[in-house]
Design a protein with these regions (language model features):
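Residue-level signal for inorganic ion chemistry
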Residues: 61-64, 83, 87, 138, ...
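Glycine-rich beta-strand-to-loop/alpha-helix junction loops that act as flexible
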Residues: 85-88, 109, 148-150, 198-200
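Gly/Ser/Thr-rich phosphate-binding loop
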Residues: 60-63, 71-127, 137-139
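AMP-binding/adenylate-forming
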Residues: 1-74, 82, 106
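Short, well-ordered beta-strand segments
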Residues: 17-19, 146, 237
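Conserved ATP/PPi-binding loop(s) of AMP-dependent carboxylate-activating enzymes
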Residues: 131-134, 141-170, 200-202
Length: 291
């Protein structure tokens, strides 16, 4: 069910080859394997080496935006036709450059509990994550995204017992804030990530999307730091493309005053640690140590 839904959007035929670029202990890595089996196509597995070498002969790959940026900047000779992007905001400049080199970019929204992708689309620079794929249902209840799908897990295994995934109404409540417009889902952010500064609510993901639009930004995270006067203030942790820029000046006419970071820090390599996602908790702890 997972593979069928994704491949209803992304062309992947029996002559195509998807690089196993993600670990199989992560649902996104398992998703590559399911799509390979469903399509009767090929899947390439290689020992760890530079990404350009790993992609030799591959038509499809699951990457994070930073990896695709580097391939494009280096004008790497690859045979890619399509890339499924995840893990960070996707700048429109990135997808446009990829399209110029014949690479279609897709993005979406998924969860481990749903065997990965729930909604997806061809990346277009807009904030939404696309429409529900076949076999998936989405609704918004009190600003929270609720889901159910054919690919949904039966539950969690805890203390020798299966704990149901769904609530009394038969839906999985995600704890994600979302909106539906014209059948397309927009993820505003995690309900757990919302914080207040001087009485104003700040959703980190909303601020991150604005900052990520700058061409020098590979990825950015907004972290709340305690403040005696305001309760919390936003700090930005940024991974730059080659060199730093004055983003504080750049965001002045793009973000409300209370949303503008009071401090800009560069993302340290140790927090990336080869993972698919960067831990917000680890970011908070690192920022606190910078004082």
């Amino acid at each position: 069910a997972s593979a069928e839904g994704v491949l209803s959007l992304i062309p992947f035929g029996d002559h195509d080859d998807w690089l196993l670029s993600l670990p199989l202990f992560h649902v996104s890595g398992q998703g590559i394997m399911w799509r390979w089996l469903y399509a009767g196509a090929r899947m390439t597995v290689r020992d760890k080496q530079p990404l350009e070498q790993m992609l030799a002969g591959c038509t499809h790959a699951s990457l994070v935006p930073t990896q695709l940026w580097r391939l494009l900047v280096n004008r790497s000779s690859v045979s890619l036709k399509a890339v499924l992007l995840g893990g960070a905001a996707i700048p429109v400049e990135l997808t446009e450059q990829a399209r110029e080199q014949g690479i279609r970019c897709f993005c979406g929204y998924g969860l481990t509990e749903f065997a990965s992708t729930v909604c997806a689309k061809e990346a277009d620079g807009l904030a939404d994550v696309g429409s529900p794929l076949p076999g998936r249902e989405v609704k918004i209840v009190n600003d929270e995204v609720w889901l159910r799908a054919a690919s949904m897990a039966e539950g969690y295994w805890r203390n020798g017992q299966r704990v149901p995934l769904v609530n009394d109404e038969g839906w999985y409540a995600t704890r994600d804030r979302g909106e539906m417009h014209n059948g397309k889902l927009t993820i505003v952010g995690r309900l757990d990530n919302l914080f207040f500064s001087g009485g104003e609510g700040i959703q980190p993901e909303e601020v991150e999307r604005v900052i990520a639009a700058h061409p020098a930004v590979l990825q950015v995270f907004i972290v709340p730091v305690a403040d005696k006067e305001f309760g919390h203030r936003p700090v930005a942790v940024v991974e730059y493309d080659q060199q730093t820029v004055d983003l504080g000046e750049w965001v002045k006419d793009k973000l409300a005053r209370f949303q503008q970071p009071v401090r800009w820090l560069t993302l340290p390599p140790e927090l990336k640690n080869g993972g698919i996602k960067i831990s917000r908790q680890a970011l908070k702890e690192w920022v606190q140590r910078q004082d």
